Amino acid sequence: RPTPPPPAWRPHAWRPFHSILGVAFGTAVNISINALLNSGYDVSGYGDNVVYLSNVPMLSMSWPVANLYYSNGGLYGSEFVYSTSRYSMSRYNTVYNSLLGVNGAPYSVQSLAGGGRRATWWGNDGQYITLNFGGDYTTGGGLRYFTTLSFGR
């Protein structure tokens, strides 16, 4: 979860969201899995309060990896991940422009080490969207570049 903006801050434009992939915030893991399967999503596993999905559509793009995060209060966040073996901000830029068109300018945009970038949008109701791009080493030791889109509250 990113650091929230000051209490007086209000977004210029914000489209509230109440669900992720059709699963409402606060929904329990078992109910979520059934709903996702019934909607045709590829649930690849679950455990430790995370539901793992593969090849998920979001913002008119396919994301090879998606995770839904849960607490005692049910679903509270998600992460959609796309990686490449070479430095390319193409997906980041496409998603950024899509979010810009719907939600207006982000609350913050940060430059990260190694040419990465992070943009954060906040709603006035505690909802947030983060979009990250950056390089990281995988467990096998290879360098990959990740575009990560997160929704939460």
Where are the model-predicted features located?
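Compositionally biased P/S/T/G-rich terminal and signal peptide-adjacent segments
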Residues: 2-12, 49-71
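Short, low-complexity Ser/Thr-rich regulatory SLiMs
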Residues: 69-72, 133-135
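Non-cytosolic coordination micro-motifs
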Residues: 1-48, 82-153
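Extracytoplasmic
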Residues: 20, 61-65, 73-75, 116, ...
